[in-house]
Structures are given as C-alpha cells and as structure tokens.
Regions:
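A generic structural motif
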Residues: 134-136
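Short coil/loop residues immediately preceding or within conserved phosphate-binding loops
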Residues: 44, 113, 125
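Generic recognition of well-ordered alpha-helical segments
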Residues: 33-36, 75, 82, 148-151
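Regulatory sensory and allosteric helical modules in signal-transduction proteins
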Residues: 45-46, 52-62, 67-111
Length: 152
C-alpha cells in the first residue's frame, strides 16, 4: 500500500496536535468508554482512538487488540488525515488504496474499516476507528451514530 500523502497543512496540523499535550502519554482510560461503545453498537471486535504525528500513529485507547503504535507510512488511518470527515471501506480488499496493505494481506487480514477524523483547532490530528476481519455494511444510520460519537 502506498503511504498516504502528507497533508498540505502538515505544519499547522502538527502544531494543533502538540498543543494538546497528550501525544506521548500512554493509553488513556478516558477514551475507553468511547471505544467500548463503538464495539458494542456496531458489533465490531476492534475500535480505537489514535493520534498521528509526523512519523507514528499513537493509539490512545483500543479494544480488541494489543497495539500502542504503528508507523505512519503503513497506517490506513493516515489516509483519513486527508479527508474532511471520514473514510468507510466495507471491504478493504476491494479498495485500491488499501488492498495491498500489510494489515489487509497479512497478520490481522482486516476487511472492514471506518475512520473518522478527529480535529483540534480545525486540523485533523487523529482518528476514531472501527475495524473487523470480515466485511460489513456501513449505512446512513451508522454514519449518523458514528458522526455523533466522533464529535464528542
């Protein structure tokens, strides 16, 4: 999978991220309620909150997987930094952007991904995501529910 492009506003994005002062703090309990709710509401095994700096995707809360970070250049979520609101892939093997990702072809063999951009000062600083190893549908009701959760 090709790495996501660097956003044109990368410097401002990184400044907004650093202004939060939580990037290098380990997993955070305050986000766990959100990720647990997503797993239950959408019947997915994995949900997480992440922040993405210049090189690394840092996991701030995760359900269903033991992961604290991954390189930005292998991250599906890094692509979400480039959109205004969200990316939804009902089957990652059918999406040209992601079908060759190591997260799709090896290891977890993910099939479903929904990632919402998390914003600070108008900048995309991270993601609220849910994933599964099997395809799912993602309809308008799901979109509205996830939009509500992501705008906390």
């Amino acid at each position: 999978m090709p790495a996501a492009e660097i956003p044109k506003n990368e410097q401002q994005r990184l400044e907004a991220l650093n202004d939060l002062g939580i990037l290098y703090i380990p997993l955070e309990d305050r986000f766990d309620r959100i990720t647990r709710t997503i797993c239950r509401l959408f019947d997915v095994p994995i949900a997480y909150v992440s922040l993405i700096d210049s090189d690394t995707q840092w996991i701030k809360s995760i359900q269903g997987l033991d992961l604290i970070d991954c390189p930005r250049n292998t991250s599906i979520c890094a692509h979400t930094l480039l959109v205004d609101e969200f990316i939804a892939c009902e089957n990652l093997t059918l999406d040209e952007r992601f079908k060759d990702s190591l997260f799709v072809t090896e290891g977890l063999k993910l099939r479903f991904y929904v990632g919402f951009a998390l914003k600070s000062h108008g900048q995309n600083i991270g993601t609220l995501c849910m994933v599964d190893t099997k395809p799912h549908t993602f309809n308008d009701d799901d979109l509205e529910a996830m939009r509500d959760i992501a705008s906390w």
